[in-house]
Structure formats: C-alpha cells, structure tokens
Amino acid sequence: MAATFLPATSLRLTQNSTLRFLSFFTISNPSYSLFRPLRRRVLPPFDAFPANSRRRCFCTAVSESLGSGDGNKVESYEKRFGSKVGEFRKKLRIAEVKGGADEGLSRVGQSLNIMGWVRTLRSQSSVTFIEINDGSCLSNLQCVMTSDAEGYDQVESGSILTGASVSVQGTIVASQGTKQKVELKVEKIIVVGECDSSYPIQKKRVSREFLRTKAHLRPRTNTFGAVARVRNTLAYATHKFFQESGFVWVASPIITASDCEGAGEQFCVTTLIPSSHENTDTSIDAIPKTKGGLIDWSQDFFGKPAFLTVSGQLNGETYATALSDVYTFGPTFRAENSNTSRHLAEFWMIEPELAFADLDDDMACATAYLQYVVKYVLDNCKEDMEFFDTWIEKGIIRRLSDVAEKEFLQLGYTDAIEILLKANKKFDFPVKWGLDLQSEHERYITEEAFGGRPVIIRDYPKEIKAFYMRENDDGKTVAAMDMLVPRIGELIGGSQREERLEVLEARLDELKLNKESYWWYLDLRRYGSVPHAGFGLGFERLVQFVTGIDNIRDVIPFPRTPASAEF
C-alpha cells in the first residue's frame, strides 16, 4: 500500500508499493515555537511552513517491493516532504547538576536550562527564591530571580504557584546560603503548566493515608519520589544480577488456566458477564449454562475457565528445562480478601528457575541475589537512603549493610519450632509441628532469636506446602525453604521442584487436583526431566524491606486491595 496525503483531504490508501514505518504530524500551532530550542531534535523548523499550513510531513519512509521507477518517486517525496528524525538528546536533570561529589561546584558559570515542578516559592524584597524538583533526585534546585529576569511578571501576577511546571534558563552560581552549594541565577522563566490553587499537596507534610487517596499526585512528594527511585533501582539491579549470572528472562503469561498454588484464590477472566460499557443490569440467568445448571465455559472466550496468574513459576519451569537458568519478573494476582498492611491483590514477583540444581543451590542463589540488590541500592541511591534513614526508619542503612555483608544462617523447620516453643514470649498464633509459621513467628526468629540476621528455614512439612515441591526421603517433609528478614518476616519462598513423574502424579491425586489441567507440566517429567529448583520473591516486600516503609500499599504506584481499584 502507498499513502497519499493532500492538504485538504483525508488519508487515502492506494494499491501501490508498500511504505513502511511511516509517521506524520500536523503543524497547527506556531506559538509552540516558544519551546523550539527544546524540541529541535524532533520537529522540523517552524518557519518551514506558513502559520496556517496543514501540510503533512513525513518523518520516515522506507520502501519495500518497489516497482520499476518507484525509487525515483520515493526520492522525490523525500525532497518535497521529508525531514530527518533528529538525534535523541537526554534532558539535563537536577541529579546531574547536584549529584557529583562537589554537589555542583564544578558547574559554576555554566548556562543551563532546567525543567521541573515548583516545590516552594518565597519572595524577599527584590529577590524571589523558587525551589524546583524534576524527580531525578531528592534535592531541589534553588532558583534565584530578580525583577530584571525575563518572565518575572509571572511571579508578580501569581501564575507561579506550588505545583506549577516551569522551564528555567540561567547560570549556575555558588550559593550564598548554607543549605546548598550552588543555585541557578535565573535569566528567563516560562510557565509550562499553571497549577490551580486547589492543589492538594501544597502543605509540607500530609499523611500517607491521605496520599493514598491522591495516588496520581503522591509521587511528587519526597517520600514517594524516593520510593519510586529505589523501586526502579531494585528492578534494574534484579535484571542486572540475573543477566550477569547467565539467566534468560522469560515473559510468563498473565492469563492462565492453571493454579500454581492450588489455593483457588484466583481472579476469573471471562466474557460471559457484560463489560462496563454494556448493560450491567443483565440478569445472572443470561449467563450460559449447561444442562446440569453449571456455567457453560465452552461459550466463553477461551472455551474453558481462565484466571489471572498467581505465579509464573510453572511456565518458568518449562523454559528452565530448555535454557537451564531463567527468571520471570512480572505482575501476579491473588483474590485473597486480606485488608492488611502486608497484602495486595496485584503485586510483582521475581521467580528464577535453575535447572540441574537442588535446594542448596536454590538457597545460595537467593542469598546472592538479595545481597547483590541491597548493596546496589546502598551504592547508587545514597541520598534517598539517607532520607529513609532520617525520616522513615533510623538505622536502616546499618541494617541493610549487615544483610549485604554478613553470612546467612539456615536451620530446619523442626529446629525452628523448638526455638519458638522455648521462647519466653506469648504468641497470638499457636506453635506446633505441622502448622505453618506466622509472621510473628518469623520475625521472632530473625529479629530476636538471631539478633537481626537473615535466616533461611528449610524442610517444611509437605502437608502445608504446594504440590510441586520435592518430597524428602523421610516422606513427611519437602525440600522447601523460606528466607526470613527483619521487619518483614518471609521475603523469599522457594523449593526444589518434584522432577519424578510418578511422585508428582501421586501428589496431585492426593490433593485431588485435576491432572488433565497439568498435562503439559507433567510432560516436563516425561521428556528429559532434570532436578531443578527455584524461588519466588514478592517485589513490593523487597521494596518495603529496603525503604523501611511499613505499609505495602505505599511501595507500589497504584495499590489494588479489597474494595479499592481507583486510578
């Protein structure tokens, strides 16, 4: 197909040679040339067309299957309409200005253009001080304006308020104050977007509970900006660790017909119920049913019940048995009606799978991973971590340094039960062999019994663990492990997977799980099965552990919890 454009007509497609990777835009607002120096890399010169021109401009045109003579046409089009896409240039960020060891002193005398949002504005006689933040770091850049600066009338008119977005040009000078080493002497300021006086986070401090109702604005605060940057660094460090260790990243599906945990706490995905833009008052009787009165899933989109995934583990195992070491990193969902500070309905999971590996290999990998990402954050997010150490959890840097440097301990589940039974402490939940450990038990072990060191508990009773975990020789326990850390409790859970077909089938039968639903998972044991192991890590709990934030709803951009799916 070839695209033909006329200034006064709509788009028309004709049956000619193919033009691929074709993009265009309309020049309709010449006043936007105010920002021309900032956008030169992507827009053609504004004076290329009359002010009222609606001519389309080709950014890129790549020909395919050109017939005889069509090459000349393309060359002609390029000369008449084409302009090359400009080079992408990274914007100068405040972190680059103030982030060095000298905190910006090496840039004194440089002319800069900074864009960001106004945090504070105060006037003193003939001088106005504006604090600007662009999200690249915790620090604001202090901008000093006098009445001779271009755009100062916007200060006098009240157009520049807290929350407004601005573009500021000026020169870096040594600061006369003591709070910062440098500041920007403003030569020109442009209000990019005004901020209404109803802006809800103008106060210096607002509660985190209030900010959860303003999740679209809370990243502009110091706390949530710092959380977002640390979360980003943890995600980057996660990929970096596994990639450097020879793992292959695998995208696991979000929609699945399998229940990895066998708990049944899944969100159903169906088209049998009217969508939001349709009549939501449709009777439940309209849902198709079988002769027996059950839902007729054969008429649903997938022809069978489908759910949002609770884990990417089973899918990860399929690739581990081909690529050896893999990991998944993506969203998972649990329809668990737990309205607590520790639970989310939607959260992210990191799930590596190691082929030709046992539980010892699994524990070693989990330990190396946690120490790597913790150290990476301490080395690369120093300003944000100092903020958390001052305002969120005093001593968090020391605590994390211990995790990064000290050896982890391991003990059996049976030994952990013995420690809890001997503890001079009253627990809310009972302690008994065969019962799962609760958060209060886990925190006692890591915080009190072992003085704040991470502890790995292994070899749990098989009755409290999932079907896929490898049965130990005693017939009562499985090769499973949980990593416990201070303040959180369980951070990582993993196991050696059951690679023996007959044992896995027997376990499915024992738990009355439908083997037909796991036919492909069983196939992995039929065709070249190998010992393999893996673990799962709730990413939000990791962010909590590293930042000291006590509520999990405050470490994910848009928390999904019971009765709450706003934004």
Swiss-Prot record:
Chief place where the protein resides: plastid
Subcellular localization: Plastid, Chloroplast; Mitochondrion
One annotated GO molecular function: ATP binding
EC numbers: 6.1.1.22
KW Cell membrane (keyword) present: no
Catalytic activity: tRNA(Asn) + L-asparagine + ATP = L-asparaginyl-tRNA(Asn) + AMP + diphosphate + H(+)
Cross-referenced SUPFAM superfamilies: Class II aaRS and biotin synthetases, Nucleic acid-binding proteins
InterPro entries named in the record: Aa-tRNA-synt_II, aa-tRNA-synth_II, aa-tRNA-synth_II/BPL/LPL, Asn-tRNA-ligase, Asp/Asn-tRNA-synth_IIb, NA-bd_OB-fold, NA-bd_OB_tRNA
GO CC annotation, single: mitochondrion
Keyword Nucleotide-binding attached: yes
Bilayer-crossing regions: none
Domain of life the protein comes from: Eukaryota
DNA-binding segment(s): 113-191
CDD domains linked to this entry: AsxRS_core (cd00776), EcAsnRS_like_N (cd04318)
Annotated PROSITE patterns: AA_TRNA_LIGASE_II
GO BP term (any one): asparaginyl-tRNA aminoacylation
Enzyme class: ligase
KO phenotype (gene knockout): Lethal. In heterozygous plants, aborted ovules.
Swiss-Prot/TrEMBL keywords: Aminoacyl-tRNA synthetase, ATP-binding, Chloroplast, DNA-binding, Ligase, Mitochondrion, Nucleotide-binding, Plastid, Protein biosynthesis, Transit peptide
Annotated family: Belongs to the class-II aminoacyl-tRNA synthetase family.
Protein name, per record: Asparagine--tRNA ligase, chloroplastic/mitochondrial
Annotated organism of origin: Arabidopsis thaliana (Mouse-ear cress)
